[in-house]
């Protein structure tokens, strides 16, 4: 893939990304110097797109973190988005020049255009060529120069794979820390980086991640590891860059936060929004000069913080937008990377293009995440955009070797849930941690009855009758029958008195179904504020709960036919600690997305004798004589589910992962003949 191909991909994605979104306001409430604005769920008009179903797909999401807000009524005003509460459809605004709009009025959001920063980097030909030259290192990593070994001695509780990550990944120029759900990926990363800083007194690290929340979690994990390892002197060398962090997460860890002048940030926001008319040349020149001065002052503050920090943490978007500043840290101008180690956390959510264009900043790179969970967000359908922006660096990850460490022990899911997730999504590599299985309290928390379900049942399919529909009110797909069933199940669990609201989570791929379920719970007197969380699956990564209720709504919808949907299903199932309930229609159960899971559950306890397929193939009635039987074909054991009309093919459902494997009848006849 060439530089021209990369540039074409970025241009295609830029063209597919709206300049602004208009949302309808439900209410605006003042909170001190801030404003909390609640939006009407599902109502959005995206610039350049017709209103309706297509526009409704461009809903409030992480791409609007850091957006600029503007409104024309009741009084024209502007503000910046300090934070998003996506599950509540809320914005938290700062530096508002007037009161935000009220009910039924519109607020316009201009998303940060980090894509423009990527385009600028791609058109910096020497930099872009240096970035593309690193592409082969992703799939064929080389050894890094020798350095101190990381022992992890202060952390005796590390599991085997976690300890292997410390020992091998720092020895590679490109390393992959693959952390499936519940395996302690963030904790492992925190320990690894704490050990790295301690063993290399002059080393500098840049830590980037996909979202502000992920940056906060990773940085705090490093700080905790330094604290637990009694390396207090190093804690002051960690620095969070950016203004959109969660202050509550840093209680007791204020030393991590930036020292930027709040007054400078507020002034900068006001000046940026006060651009004069283009016809007034003198006013425009004065405005431009003042803005340039303020931005230079801000850059100086940031540059000072970066030079003082040994580990700087920020979002990948901020790193991309500030690429020039980060490059300037190569103070000798020798073209050397300014950081010894560049860490991409939640790397599966960062595009290959963005990753490569940041990689020259580090002498070595470490990718932490899970390619079987959420992928980069992509709007363009152009093939070039799919190649560069729809995939992450994990697409080039080697299958094995010292550069890849799979954390294979998890302590979240009960064994049957873990087995299902492991076989369907991780080829059987994921297992329950030995220390968890040896802990009676851990086992007891995962052996609890739920209404009519015994404690020993962990994965349950609830049949659903009733069609789905498109909701004009909620701007998305809904299925009333499954919503009612979920509401009833939650109500019964709470009425039993053995479950607390915070222990129950409802997940669905669609916001419209989320809204319908929320209204159903409210009608039963169950308010979400009391603890029962109803969420889209997209927002659930990183969370967990004892019980998960999953409602796919309609598996025939185009979105649920994609590879992204498979990743969402993994996220949904792997949030559950004790039980996961799936609400499926017959059509859902037969869909490409869910059929393997349903078949795996059906065959999991099959105790029938296994007949070698080769034996059946020797009979004249083959392959009809194999239909419905439990057979073995090579290393695969399962049930012959169906035959082709002409009898030339048969499909064997693998009882380990539920996948249907096509087999050639003539091949097996020949194999049986040779054996005889």
Language-model segments: which ranges?
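Pre-ATPase regulatory/linker segments immediately N-terminal to the P-loop/RecA-like helicase/translocase core
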Residues: 1-164, 235, 241, 246-274
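SH3/SH3-like beta-barrel fold
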Residues: 93-95, 650-655
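Short aromatic-glycine-enriched beta-strand elements
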Residues: 35, 647-651
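Conserved helicase motor core of SF1/SF2 NTP-dependent helicases
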Residues: 199-203, 317-319, 329-628
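Intrinsically disordered, low-complexity, charged/polar segments
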Residues: 657-676
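Conserved P-loop NTPase mechanochemical-coupling segment
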Residues: 273-315
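ASCE P-loop NTPase helicase motor core
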Residues: 136-255, 307-431, 588
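Short coil-to-beta-strand transition motifs
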Residues: 72-79, 629-637
């Amino acid at each position: 893939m060439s530089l021209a191909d990369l540039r074409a991909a970025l241009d295609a994605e830029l063209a597919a990304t709206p300049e602004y979104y208009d949302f309808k306001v439900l209410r605006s409430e003042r909170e001190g110097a801030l404003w909390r604005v609640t939006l009407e769920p599902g109502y959005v008009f995206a610039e350049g797109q017709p209103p309706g179903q297509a526009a409704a797909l461009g809903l409030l999401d992480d791409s609007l973190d850091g957006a600029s807000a503007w409104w024309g009524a009741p009084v024209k005003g502007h503000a910046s988005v300090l934070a998003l509460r996506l599950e509540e459809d809320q914005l938290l605004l700062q530096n508002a020049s007037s009161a935000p709009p009220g009910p039924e009025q519109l607020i316009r959001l201009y998303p940060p255009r980090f894509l423009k920063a990527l385009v600028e980097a791609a058109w910096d030909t020497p930099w872009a060529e240096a970035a593309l030259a690193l592409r082969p290192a992703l799939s064929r990593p080389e050894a890094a120069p020798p350095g101190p070994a990381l022992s992890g001695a202060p952390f005796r509780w590390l599991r085997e794979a976690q300890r292997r990550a410390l020992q091998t990944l720092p020895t590679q120029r490109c390393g992959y820390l693959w952390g499936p759900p519940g395996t302690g990926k963030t904790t492992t990363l925190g320990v690894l980086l704490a050990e790295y800083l301690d063993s290399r007194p002059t080393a500098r690290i840049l830590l980037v991640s996909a979202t502000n929340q992920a940056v906060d979690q990773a940085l705090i994990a490093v700080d905790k590891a330094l604290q637990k390892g009694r390396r207090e002197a190093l804690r002051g060398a960690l620095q969070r860059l950016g203004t959109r962090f969660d202050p509550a997460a840093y209680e007791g860890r204020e030393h991590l936060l930036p020292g930027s002048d709040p007054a400078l940030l507020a002034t900068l926001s006001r000046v940026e929004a006060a651009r004069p008319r283009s016809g007034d040349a003198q006013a425009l020149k004065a405005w431009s000069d003042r803005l340039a001065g303020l931005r230079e002052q801000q850059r100086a503050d940031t540059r000072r913080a970066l030079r003082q920090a040994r580990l700087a943490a920020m979002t990948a978007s901020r790193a991309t937008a500030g690429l020039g500043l980060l490059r300037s840290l190569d103070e000798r101008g020798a073209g050397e990377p300014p950081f010894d180690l560049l860490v991409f956390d939640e790397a599966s959510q960062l595009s290959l293009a963005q990753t490569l264009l940041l990689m020259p900043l580090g002498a070595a790179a470490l990718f932490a995440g899970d390619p079987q969970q959420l992928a980069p967000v992509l709007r363009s359908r152009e093939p070039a955009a799919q190649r560069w922006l729809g995939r992450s660096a994990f697409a080039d990850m080697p299958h094995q070797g010292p550069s890849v460490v799979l954390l294979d022990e998890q302590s979240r899911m009960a064994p049957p849930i873990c087995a299902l997730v492991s076989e369907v999504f991780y080829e059987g590599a994921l297992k329950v941690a030995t220390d968890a299985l040896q802990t009676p309290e851990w086992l007891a928390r995962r052996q609890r009855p739920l209404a009519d379900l015994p404690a020993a049942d962990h994965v349950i399919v609830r049949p659903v009758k009733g069609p789905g529909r498109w909701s004009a009110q909620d701007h998305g797909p809904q299925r009333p029958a499954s919503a009612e069933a979920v509401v009833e199940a939650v109500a019964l669990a709470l009425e039993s008195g053995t479950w607390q609201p915070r222990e129950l989570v409802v997940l669905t791929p669609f916001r419209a179904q989320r809204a319908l379920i929320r209204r159903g719970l409210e009608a039963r007197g169950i308010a979400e504020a009391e603890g029962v969380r109803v969420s889209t699956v997209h927002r659930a990564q990183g969370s967990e709960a004892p019980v998960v209720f999953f409602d796919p709504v309609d598996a025939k919808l185009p979105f649920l036919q994609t590879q992204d949907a498979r990743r969402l299903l993994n996220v949904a199932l792997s949030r559950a600690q004790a039980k996961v309930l799936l609400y499926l229609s017959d059509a859902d159960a037969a869909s490409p997305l869910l059929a393997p899971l349903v078949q795996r559950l059906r065959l999991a306890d099959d105790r029938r004798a296994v007949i070698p397929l080769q034996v059946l193939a020797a009979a004249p009635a083959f392959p009809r004589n194999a239909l419905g039987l439990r057979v073995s074909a090579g290393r695969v054991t399962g049930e012959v589910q169906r035959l082709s009309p002409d009898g030339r093919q048969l499909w064997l459902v693998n009882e380990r992962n539920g996948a249907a494997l096509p087999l050639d009848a003539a091949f097996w006849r020949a194999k049986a003949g040779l054996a005889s």
